[in-house]
């Protein structure tokens, strides 16, 4: 079961969107929300406020990508931030032994990788057009910001 819940910012004036409707979908997102809220260098941010249309090749149809975070720092630079496990930011590795379970897991990983890369290409393209920087934040980056959890 995924770790999720509602979250309320202390610095409501920094949040763009409805502060009563903020949902974290992982303990990593919750940590990053708290970091954004406390960090004086972040002047504005929102959770799932940027919606990016993309074509999902795995499903053969148009979809909408709800970016995890939009933020603006004190220099005025805007960022799209996607929070993902490092494992999902790299192409899957074919298992050495192709058991039924390993094949199924590998196929799921290929599907996830395909969907993610389609989303990230669309996000990067839109970001470049708007002068926004697109970043994928993994557990390594979160630890560098002070995350202590698993």
Curated annotation (Swiss-Prot):
Active site: 29, 68, 84
Enzyme Commission identifier(s): 3.1.-.-
Keyword Hydrolase carried by entry: yes
Keywords (A to Z) from UniProt: Endonuclease, Exonuclease, Hydrolase, Nuclease
Highest rank taxon of the organism: Viruses
Gene Ontology molecular-function annotations: endonuclease activity; exonuclease activity
Family that this chain belongs to: Belongs to the Caudovirales head completion nuclease family.
Role summary: During phage morphogenesis, plays an essential role in the head-tail joining step. The associated nuclease activity is essential for morphogenesis, possibly by cleaving packaged DNA to enable the joining of heads to tails. Displays both exo- and endonuclease activity.
Name of this chain's protein: Head completion nuclease
Species for this entry: Enterobacteria phage T4 (Bacteriophage T4)
